[in-house]
Amino acid sequence: MDDPSIASGFQQGTGRTTGANGTQIQREGLDGLLRQYPIQCIGTSLLVALLTTIIIYYSSSSSFPSATIKKTPPIPEINPLGGIFYPSKTKAAITAYLTNARGLVTDFFRQNPGKLAAQLHTQIGTIIVLASSTAEEIAHDERFHLRKQTAKTFNAHLPGFEVFRDDYNNHLMKNVVTKYFNKQLTKVTGILAHEMDLALGELFTTAKEGQQWTEIPLHATALQIVARLSGRVFLGEDLGRDPEWLRITAGYAGVVTMAFADLSKWPAWLRSTANRFLPRCKASREYMDGVRRKLRPVIAQRRKERRTSSREYREYNDAIEWFELESNGNAYDPEIVQLSLSLAAIHTAGDLLAQTLTEVATHCEIIEPLKEEMRGILAKGGWQKSSLDKMILLDSVIKESQRRKPLATLSMGRIAVTDAKLSDGTVVPKDSTVSIDAGLMWDPSIYAQPDEWDPYRFVRQRKGSLEKQRLAELTTTAPEHLAFGHGMHACPGRFFAANEVKIAMIKILLGYDIKFADGVEPKVMVHGITLDPDRRVRLSIWRREDGHGGF
């Protein structure tokens, strides 16, 4: 996954804001320090020591990234900071980022059309934001490194966040996805359809007597569905359906990004300590311990079988086996790679499924056309990947839902591994965090009425040139649709994620009526460039008597 998301760690979108919580916490930390040591009771030397401590505190604080991030004067600032002598200006800059990052970036590049880069100060540091027009320029540029950016952003050196490390494990994972996993797509459509039936039987409880509609937590259920489907392919029937494994993987996917957000409110030099006691950080470590408890006996047994009798060794067709084969005897962490694989799948596909269901339930008029397309194609071709490929309206609905709310308003997060000169002469300094403005996804010159959800938008685009037809497909990446990233680090698992979401949507819409309760208007929770779903939203479901309509 090109963590535009996980990957960026920061993201934003349209909707209600959550507020500048990080700034509030930093202020409370200082207020507490002053309350603890009343000024009138402090001698001169102690007062000097206290003031020195305050300066160090703020200089190291994530509220003042300019004190820890090397400035690059030739690159303009979107939200200039005030430094330690003008804290109110810095507070205003960070608050502006937390509540309106997308607007800040859009306004800057609109007002400065000749600029390719600008500095955006966030609560955890400075990002050099590159204009959308540079997406092709750096798409295959090896001077910009994906995993180093992810490791830096997500504190990968700390326990609980090991899945984000830039090491052999993650290089191995990408190789497995491209070499083994994507080749399974044509073979697993029917398997996933059956698994979805089992998952819905457990997660979409039937209405109680005298009650027509049942409510379910939308986002949490979407994560559980994707965990179930992914686990079936990654680990086979037994472990992939194990309730404890599903609880661990879905739980980790749900908590780790929030743990990162909690940790980012602390100064970098205190994060190692904070990681020990922050509740969500502790939960991340506990989930990781659970992964090791579940997988170690399985992996040990398989390795023993392979060593003792190659004749009797049963070949497995799952991710555990693929990692063993691809590692070719080199040391790696099998528990970490499995959790990384699950996290990438659940985080990306789970969010996309939840957002697509949100849009469809909000615009119920699209449900019947979708069901008509689904029934017609399945009646002719059955549960084959080719059938999914023919569902053009469903593909458009999912892509449009993703366009409206991707995981981030910046994409293609990278670290510059050397000083890198752009085509306009701008030099991006070594070790800078870089991301691309994904604003073309809401550009009215590209998408008519971009703030509106148009389920037929990409259906119409398929009637254009061959290039427009290609760009209309859900899994195609381009500068005007960066939700899956772009270039050599584009999300390698996007093809599987697309199939998972399509199968889930088919089974849900053919088997259930869905709606939101009267007055419910799902909001997007904005925190900097992070765009999160409203996790409190509940979806109303009603299982129809005709079940899945024969499918």
Curated annotation (Swiss-Prot):
Enzyme Commission code(s) on record: 1.-.-.-
Glycosylated residues, chain numbering: 21
Location in or out of the cell: Membrane
GO biological process, any: secondary metabolic process
Binding, heme: 491
InterPro entries cross-referenced by the UniProt entry: Cyt_P450, Cyt_P450_CS, Cyt_P450_E_grp-IV, Cyt_P450_sf
Annotated spans, Disordered: 1-23
Pathway: Antibiotic biosynthesis
Regions that span the bilayer: 41-57
Cystine residue pairs: none
Record key words, sorted: Antibiotic biosynthesis, Glycoprotein, Heme, Iron, Membrane, Metal-binding, Monooxygenase, Oxidoreductase, Transmembrane, Transmembrane helix
Membrane topology: Single-pass membrane protein
GO cellular component, one term: membrane
Biased composition (Polar residues): 8-23
Cofactor(s) for this UniProt protein: heme
Gene3D superfamilies assigned: Cytochrome P450 (1.10.630.10)
A GO molecular-function annotation: monooxygenase activity
Family according to the record: Belongs to the cytochrome P450 family.
Functional summary from the UniProt entry: Cytochrome P450 monooxygenase; part of the gene cluster that mediates the biosynthesis of sordarin and hypoxysordarin, glycoside antibiotics with a unique tetracyclic diterpene aglycone structure. First, the geranylgeranyl diphosphate synthase sdnC constructs GGDP from farnesyl diphosphate and isopentenyl diphosphate. The diterpene cyclase sdnA then catalyzes the cyclization of GGDP to afford cycloaraneosene.
PANTHER family noted in UniProt: CYTOCHROME P450, CYTOCHROME P450 MONOOXYGENASE AUSG-RELATED
The protein, known as: Cytochrome P450 monooxygenase sdnQ
Species in which this protein is naturally found: Sordaria araneosa (Pleurage araneosa)
Lineage: Eukaryota, Fungi, Dikarya, Ascomycota, Pezizomycotina
Gene field: sdnQ
